[in-house]
């Protein structure tokens, strides 16, 4: 057995831990991009500039989730063929997806750049931060193809059991981003534009190096393959489209929630934006475990080692419980200090109250998010996308309905009160579907 095949040979808990830890660290450093922007802008420019950057977060997440969802479709098939040692089909999927998604990313970037002001206006962005928010967003969309390509390549690496290379690249680009943020924002005084430009350059460097390293990595599997295969593209889209719909629709929902928050004013938005950054950091621990479970399940399914799938699921749940406890302790003891990193000295009492209340509420219920993500990861790995999509839509419906109906009448707290209820409902639906779909040793749910 090759050392690349440890996901189908090592003990499930050991394999998932080894595989997931670089992904968790990588996800953390990916969030450092946005955190560096927010902290440095908040400290050196002010809370209004922080609100401008934060106002873009919900919209940029929609486009990021399109990239992540597209990567899921390719990643599940790459893992399946890798586990089955069908390297010809694996390389065909890799080439087909890179060509297709490169074109898509350019089109999406051009669309986002051209309609930045319209989209921010539709979100009811406060007038005093609208121009800065649009500027940040337009610079972001110039670099969107780099971000899209990096996310696709990162999924490819993890699909073949390699999670350390994306980690190394992210550490490098994150450090580069922080230094350029400090130079452009603090020294040159470029404000929001400097923060966006620093992120663009760092993401571009990461994408280029990822592409070159991945090309070199693929030389290990010497076989004939097709540069573009329409049939394989259709198979990939069968998995990718539900995932894109799920991820982008949830982000659109969060964008609608952002529109609910905006009328509460710039300071409330600053507090909300600060905690959204913190939520992204902690939630990525659970997202990474879910993302690690998918290739684990898919590789073992491709290798016809279906008895290992349920053991891997239990191992993922154990990891989620540990991380939920860690998140609770950190938030409960340090929530004020964490808020001050983003809000700085000119953050008002309202901004600190919104940030602290939202953050502590999340800390109590992160366990629901963890078990939801692990269950969703198994469904993706098995290619069972319909219940996965339905469960996430129910999650979104709960969050949106409470925010839209109750927040304008009874206060901003209702924006986050329904979050854990949505996570729990999502888990229950996904788990019910999973119990009916466990493969056995005689059944293989391969996509063919």
Q: Model features per residue range: what roles?
A:
Residues 50-110, 147-166, 271-335, 369-383, ...:
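Small-residue-rich hydrophobic transmembrane alpha-helices
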Residues 18, 41-61, 127-132, 192-193, ...:
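Interfacial/gating helices of multi-pass transporter permease domains
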Residues 9, 13-32, 36, 59-66, ...:
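Residue-level signal for short hydrophobic patches within transmembrane helices
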Residues 62-65, 177-181, 206-211, 281-284, ...:
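Hydrophobic transmembrane alpha-helices of multi-pass small-molecule transporters
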């Amino acid at each position: 057995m090759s050392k690349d095949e440890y996901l189908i040979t090592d003990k499930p808990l050991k394999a998932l831990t080894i595989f997931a830890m670089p992904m968790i660290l990588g996800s953390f450093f990916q969030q450092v991009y946005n955190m560096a922007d927010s902290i440095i802008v908040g400290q050196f420019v002010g809370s209004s500039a922080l609100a401008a950057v934060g106002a873009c977060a919900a919209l940029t997440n929609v486009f990021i989730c399109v990239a992540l969802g597209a990567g899921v479709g390719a990643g599940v098939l790459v893992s399946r063929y890798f586990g089955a040692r069908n390297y010809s089909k694996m390389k065909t999927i890799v080439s087909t997806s890179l060509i297709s998604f490169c074109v898509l990313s350019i089109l999406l970037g051009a669309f986002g750049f051209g309609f930045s002001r319209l989209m921010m206006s539709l979100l009811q962005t406060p007038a005093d931060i609208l121009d800065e928010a649009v500027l940040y967003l337009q610079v972001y969309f110039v670099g969107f193809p780099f971000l899209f390509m990096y996310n696709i390549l990162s999924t490819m690496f993890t699909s073949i059991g390699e999670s350390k290379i994306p980690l190394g690249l992210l550490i490098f680009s994150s450090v580069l981003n922080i230094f350029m943020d400090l130079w452009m924002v603090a020294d040159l005084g470029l404000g929001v534009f400097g923060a966006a430009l620093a992120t663009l350059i760092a993401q571009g460097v990461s994408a280029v190096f990822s592409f070159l390293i991945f090309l070199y990595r693929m030389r290990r599997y010497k076989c004939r393959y097709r540069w573009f295969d329409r049939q394989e593209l259709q198979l990939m889209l069968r998995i990718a489209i539900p995932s894109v719909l799920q991820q982008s629709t949830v982000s659109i929902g969060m964008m609608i929630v952002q529109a609910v928050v905006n009328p509460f004013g710039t300071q409330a938005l600053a507090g909300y934006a600060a905690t959204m950054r913190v939520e992204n950091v902690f939630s990525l621990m659970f997202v990474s475990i879910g993302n690690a479970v998918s290739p684990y399940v898919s590789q073992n399914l491709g290798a016809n080692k279906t008895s290992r799938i349920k053991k891997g699921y239990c191992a993922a749940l154990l990891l989620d419980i540990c991380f939920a406890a860690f998140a609770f302790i950190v938030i409960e003891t340090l929530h004020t200090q964490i808020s001050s990193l983003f809000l700085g000295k000119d953050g008002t009492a309202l901004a600190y109250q919104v940030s602290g209340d939202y953050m502590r509420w999340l800390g109590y219920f992160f366990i629901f998010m963890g078990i939801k993500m692990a269950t969703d990861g198994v469904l993706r790995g098995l290619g069972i996308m319909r219940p996965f999509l339905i469960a996430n839509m129910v999650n979104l419906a709960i969050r949106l309905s409470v925010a839209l109906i109750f927040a304008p009448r009874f206060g901003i707290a209702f924006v986050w009160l329904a979050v854990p209820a949505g996570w729990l409902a999502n888990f229950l639906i996904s788990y019910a579907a999973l119990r009916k779909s466990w493969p056995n040793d005689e059944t293989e749910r391969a996509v063919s």
